[in-house]
Design a protein with these regions (language model features):
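Aromatic-lined carbohydrate-binding/catalytic grooves of carbohydrate-active enzymes
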Residues: 113-251, 264, 274, 281
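Generic detector of well-ordered alpha-helical packing
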Residues: 83, 123, 153-155, 267-269, ...
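N-terminal accessory beta-strand-rich subdomains and adjacent acidic, glycine-rich linkers
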Residues: 1-103, 108
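Active-site neighborhood of glycoside hydrolase catalytic domains
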Residues: 175-183, 193, 215-375, 383-385, ...
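Hydrophobic anchor at the start of a short beta-strand
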Residues: 82, 198, 311
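Short, glycine-/Ser/Thr-/acidic-enriched flexible segments
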Residues: 41, 86, 125, 205, ...
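Short, flexible loop/turn elements at secondary-structure junctions
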Residues: 40, 77, 124, 157, ...
Length: 395
């Protein structure tokens, strides 16, 4: 940079979509290593450079130059920046250990829910978003037989049309996928009867453009720019600064926990709404920042109401693996990588970003694999939180 700086920037709502909000600086002469992390679930920037006095290092959340963020302060009004933290060590390995110690100490969730449990999820290289009672019951039996403690029904459980991407948002179970008088309760009861905790996939922050909820909620419940709702890949984005948006999601969580006994939610986030919303905000970046903070407060509210419930931060396979999120979620999905041969590199480096017991790296053995392939596959998930998929009922 002609101004003598090196900057790394992340834009939009995927805080780890391209780069990690984490860096290491090493002074070899002094034998010192500093590790810095930006603790924010949105846009951020860090830079290192020289000024007229000395070298410097700066970390920040959204900025004007990169993220269209400005904030007007009236006299005596205050603004709090996004948090950042740093550790000092003599080596990078020691710095990572210090970060892990810090992350464990500052976790915001009930410690009884952070103990690793073996998780089975029906998605990866298995049902792939097409669950039915007929498909799930054999997998439930197989998962229980191998000692799984949590069984998660992934995406598709709410879909009657076969085209669920633009219609999500009500989060009501399908009656065609789960027929009979009990519907999805038959599946949830089977999971509980097998001694496992039932879990469901949710993408709470989006409402499909074809969803009935899109017409029920006011425009204020959604991201807007220039007086119009933001549309991203046939989805509207909920703005959790709005009371009606938050009430909608609180009602969804309350219903799923109380009616179906859900004890685990996999929270996904598969679209990024660009720079933000200008509705009731000083700038689009300001609207994005305040929504991100409102989202974290909503997550905190789930923990207050249901301290026993376990939350997984998926966010499109690790696209929001920042400490603002991971301090509030017991489980962090590290990737959606489908090739078991490519996953070990991800699993081995995941503890740089999260506490090892949070890092959920997929293992998806299949009956067609030989012993070496199966062992290679399973070993990947042993590096963190045990996270299993595959047709184990056929093995």
């Amino acid at each position: 940079d002609p101004r003598g700086e090196h900057a790394v920037v992340s834009t939009g709502a995927w805080s780890t979509g391209s780069m990690a909000p984490l860096t290491f600086l090493e002074n070899k002469d002094a034998g010192a290593v500093w590790a810095f992390q930006v603790e924010h679930n949105g846009a951020w920037r860090w830079e290192v450079g020289n000024n007229t006095v000395d070298g410097y290092f700066a970390v920040s959340g959204p900025t004007n130059i990169n993220h269209a963020w400005t904030k007007k302060l009236d006299p005596n009004e205050c603004f709090t920046t996004v948090p950042a933290s740093f550790v000092l060590a003599s080596t990078q390995q020691e710095a990572i250990a210090n970060l892990t110690q810090y992350r464990r100490a500052c976790r915001r969730v009930d410690s009884t829910t952070t103990q690793p449990r073996i998780i089975f999820n029906d998605y990866m290289n298995t049902i792939n978003g097409d669950p039915t009672t007929e498909k799930l019951l054999p997998l439930i039996s197989g998962a229980a037989e191998v000692g799984c403690e949590i069984f998660v029904v992934d995406c598709g459980w709410y879909d009657d049309s076969g085209d669920w991407w633009p219609s999500v948002g009500e989060w009501l179970p399908s009656k065609t996928r789960f027929p009979g008088s009990k519907g999805i309760v038959e599946v949830m009861d089977a999971i509980k009867d097998a001694g496992m905790i039932p879990g469901l996939w949710l993408e709470p922050e989006v409402i499909g453009v074809k969803s009935p909820v899109a017409q029920k909620l006011p425009d204020s419940a959604f991201f807007q720019r220039n007086g119009h709702r933001v549309v991203e890949q046939e989805r509207y984005i909920l703005d959790l600064r709005d009371g009606s948006a938050r009430k909608h999601l609180d009602d969804v969580i309350d219903r799923l926990v109380n009616d179906y006994g859900i004890g685990y939610f996999k929270m996904d986030y598969n679209v990024s709404p660009g720079s933000g919303t200008d509705y009731q905000a000083d700038s689009v970046g300001d609207g994005m920042l305040e929504h991100n903070r409102a989202y974290l407060d909503w997550i905190d509210g789930i923990h207050r109401r249901y301290p026993h419930v376990i939350l997984e931060n998926c966010s499109s396979g690790g696209m929001r693996e920042d400490y603002a999120q991971t301090s509030r979620f017991q489980v962090q999905s590290t990737s959606d990588q489908q090739d078991y041969r490519l996953y070990p590199a991800i699993a081995a480096t995941a503890p740089v970003m999260v506490a090892p017991e949070q890092a959920a790296s997929w293992a998806y053995p299949q009956s067609s694999m030989n012993a070496e392939q199966t062992a290679f596959n399973i070993n990947t998930t042993l590096l963190g939180r045990f996270f299993l998929s595959g047709y184990i009922n056929r093995m």
